[in-house]
UniProtKB/Swiss-Prot annotation:
UDP-N-acetyl-alpha-D-glucosamine binds at T10, G11, G12, N124, S183, Q283. The keyword Cell inner membrane applies. Transmembrane segments: none annotated. It catalyses: di-trans,octa-cis-undecaprenyl diphospho-N-acetyl-alpha-D-muramoyl-L-alanyl-D-glutamyl-meso-2,6-diaminopimeloyl-D-alanyl-D-alanine + UDP-N-acetyl-alpha-D-glucosamine = di-trans,octa-cis-undecaprenyl diphospho-[N-acetyl-alpha-D-glucosaminyl-(1->4)]-N-acetyl-alpha-D-muramoyl-L-alanyl-D-glutamyl-meso-2,6-diaminopimeloyl-D-alanyl-D-alanine + UDP + H(+). This is UDP-N-acetylglucosamine--N-acetylmuramyl-(pentapeptide) pyrophosphoryl-undecaprenol N-acetylglucosamine transferase. HAMAP family: MurG. It comes from Helicobacter acinonychis (strain Sheeba).
Amino acid sequence: MKVALTGGGTGGHLSIAKALAIELEKQGVEAIYLGSTYGQDKEWFEDSPLFSECYFFNTQGVVNKSFFKKIGSLFLQAKAALKAKEILKKHQITHTISVGGFSAGPASFASLLNKIPLYIHEQNAIKGSLNRYLSPKAKAVFSSYAFKDKGNHIVTSYPVQNVFFDHARTRTEIKHILFIGGSQGAKAINEFALFNAPKLTKQGIEITHICGPNSYERVRFFYQELGLLDKIVLFAFHNNIIEVMQKADLCVSRAGASSVWELCANGLPTIFIPYPFASNNHQYHNVLEFEKENLCYVVPQNELLPKKLFEVIRKLNQKDEQGHKNLTIISNKLQQKIAKDGAKTIIERILSA
């Protein structure tokens, strides 16, 4: 038995791949990885001990491109699929697991050509274009969201790494706020943090701000101009997100699925600002259920005024009839919403099929 893991491009897809790879290693199953030279795949897995071999193809996404660029991208995908076909055959792969993203294309199509069972994990509440096409052809599609086209879909707990559960805690007071601008550096969140920093620090609330590599110098300059550089903790990027997450009592973040469920597992109440240009507005749909259950606060980017933060803080500090803070109630309920060992459940279902 030998498994090929494929897909990525962004941290959300790659964090799932990592969680599944860790579980495969625990179960003594050898795995290889097939991704792209474009995006973050190499950064995550090029030297990873989780895989016996890693392959990175010259591929790019097709979505949101002009007609001629789409043709070029499809040509690269087809060329890579032929290479992937030979790689899967060479390694005698018995199962292929796709975590989605454009870099999953070549190995997924190669698996179908080689008649290797294909399993898909769909991370978002709205399927990506590749997964929409491949889902009917897959042996099973795993997701933490229930889709209308049930068919071969299996609802499981999100494959969050155990470290997020292990460092979970119930929040009782807002002493520390974490702003996550993401690897791309969300300008709206970065500016939201900068606007609110003077008042927050004046109130004695600590700030950790991950602003993204491309925004680091600009954001650092503005904190310096505000005279706050020595009063906040600023990162361009952080390799160990749980280290900063566990210290925080409130988070401000985009609504990528992996971030949503990692924050949930850690019991960290969050203000989500969904990326408004995400395909099919999937970031908003990722947190829609959470919002309906009063487990988070969702603020559209075009309504992100500085005062929103303090409105949410006031709501979180309010108490119910039993004297429990909303902050604590939400933190407890978040930890109950997601079960541990999502990756283990998925891998066991695949290996026993």
